[in-house]
């Protein structure tokens, strides 16, 4: 049944009867031309569905498939809005029937897009907030002047250059990082908390010297999760924090590390094991961004970025805890938030420790790159010998002849 009433988007004096309804807000319209003037609603709907899939495929595939199908047909259609997947009024069965109407090849292609973590390329580019006023050209100079540093080993890129990523086993990092982390406007820098308690007020005894090594692990998860969720969205707050706590053993499992390299490798292992999508940064890119955050804007305010990141984390975890229903989830979020507040107080009083941590992270970044290049070279050689990506079937070397 066609919707009753006039079109809500026709120019004054040219109002036509409405023949269709917007699938998102049910606004009446008469033609494809009028629907396109209402394009923001459709784009927002599409973005919500893609983000829903990125947060762990919790949204039913029928909703995202219908959005993709509708947008594709809309581009191909010029005159007949009915052919663009826009039915007259609510379609029988709603959106759930559109997934079944896709051909098997279309379903497989769409599922490959999600399984490879490439759906993020469909979203607008996003730029980390710590690139806004990064140290940039001074980065190498700071590392060179740091005690015990080896400038020949450390090659952190300028603040406006995408990370020099290599292929991980699970994703092609350079292309994804370049598209999602390109030179585009980014989010505003989070505000550093105005009241940071003294570390002695949060600890009953002496602070362990291993506390510092939890920072790289937490910041790795922070950079990875922000890039994966394109800066985060309150609608995805629960999933954002689930990814954060899943990648960071320091936040999610109260894990302790003996070195910065161990802390980074623990987080990288979670991604390499496939427990979470690699995201646009990948493991190398996330290590690179940890060093950037630890270096801050420069020597005059090196701890600023780390304080801002930890403060942002504490606020985010606090908001998620208020929304959580299950007691176990609330407890996990509470402990993670307390950990961030403790690291915030520690960082505020130990700014001098950030440069050595940044150096350790930069070395771990390069060591990971060397290993990745060696694996890629070995893989290429094996594929050359095999004549393809899989080894040939074993041949029988000795065969007993019948008597």
From Swiss-Prot:
Zn(2+) 1 binds at residues 7, 10, 30, 34. CDD domains: zf-HIT_ZNHIT2-3. A zinc finger (HIT-type) spans 7-41. PROSITE patterns: ZF_HIT (PS51083). Signal peptide: none annotated. Zn(2+) 2 binds at residues 22, 25, 38, 41. Residues 72-98 are annotated as: Disordered. GO terms for molecular function: zinc ion binding. Changing residue 59 to P: In a breast cancer sample; somatic mutation. InterPro entries: Znf_HIT (IPR007529), ZNHIT2 (IPR039646). Keywords: Acetylation, Metal-binding, Phosphoprotein, Zinc, Zinc-finger. May act as a bridging factor mediating the interaction between the R2TP/Prefoldin-like (R2TP/PFDL) complex and U5 small nuclear ribonucleoprotein (U5 snRNP). Required for the interaction of R2TP complex subunit RPAP3 and prefoldin-like subunit URI1 with U5 snRNP proteins EFTUD2 and PRPF8. May play a role in regulating the composition of the U5 snRNP complex. This is Zinc finger HIT domain-containing protein 2. It comes from Homo sapiens (Human).
């Amino acid at each position: 049944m066609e919707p009753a009433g006039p079109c809500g988007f026709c120019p004054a004096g040219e109002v036509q009867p409405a023949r269709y309804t917007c699938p998102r807000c049910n606004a009446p319209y008469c033609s494809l031309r009028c629907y396109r003037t209402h394009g923001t609603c459709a784009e927002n709907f599409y973005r919500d569905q893609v983000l829903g899939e990125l947060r762990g495929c919790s949204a039913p595939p029928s909703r995202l498939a219908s959005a993709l199908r509708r947008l594709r047909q809309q581009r191909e259609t010029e005159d007949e809005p009915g052919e663009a997947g826009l039915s007259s009024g609510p379609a029988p069965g709603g959106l759930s029937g559109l997934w079944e109407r896709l051909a098997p090849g279309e379903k497989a292609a769409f599922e490959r897009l999600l399984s490879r973590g490439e759906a993020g390329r469909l979203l607008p580019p996003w730029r980390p907030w710590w690139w806004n006023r990064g140290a940039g050209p001074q980065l190498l100079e700071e590392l060179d002047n740091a005690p015990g540093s080896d400038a020949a080993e450390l090659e952190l890129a300028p603040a406006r250059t995408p990370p020099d990523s290599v292929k991980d086993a699970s994703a092609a990092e350079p292309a994804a990082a370049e598209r999602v982390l390109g030179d585009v406007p980014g989010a505003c820098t989070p505000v550093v908390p105005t009241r940071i308690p003294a570390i002695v007020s949060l600890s009953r005894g002496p602070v362990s010297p291993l506390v510092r090594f939890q920072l790289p692990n937490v910041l790795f998860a922070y950079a990875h999760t922000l890039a994966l969720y394109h800066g985060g969205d309150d609608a995805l707050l629960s999933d954002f924090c689930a990814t954060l706590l899943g990648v960071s053993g320091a936040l999610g499992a109260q894990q302790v590390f003996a070195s910065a390299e161990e802390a980074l490798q623990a987080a990288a292992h979670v991604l390499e094991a496939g427990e979470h999508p690699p995201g646009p940064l990948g493991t190398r890119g996330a290590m690179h961004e940890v060093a950037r955050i630890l270096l801050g804007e420069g020597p005059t305010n090196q701890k600023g970025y780390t304080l801002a990141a930890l403060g942002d984390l504490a606020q985010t975890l606090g908001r998620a805890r208020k929304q959580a229903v299950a007691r176990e989830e609330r407890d996990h979020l509470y402990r993670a938030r307390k950990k961030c507040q403790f690291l915030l107080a520690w960082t505020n009083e130990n700014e001098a420790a950030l440069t050595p941590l940044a150096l350790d992270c930069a070395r771990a970044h390069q060591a990971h790159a060397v290993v990745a290049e060696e694996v890629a070279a070995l893989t290429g050689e094996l594929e050359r010998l095999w004549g393809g990506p899989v080894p040939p079937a074993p041949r029988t070397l000795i065969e007993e002849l019948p008597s």
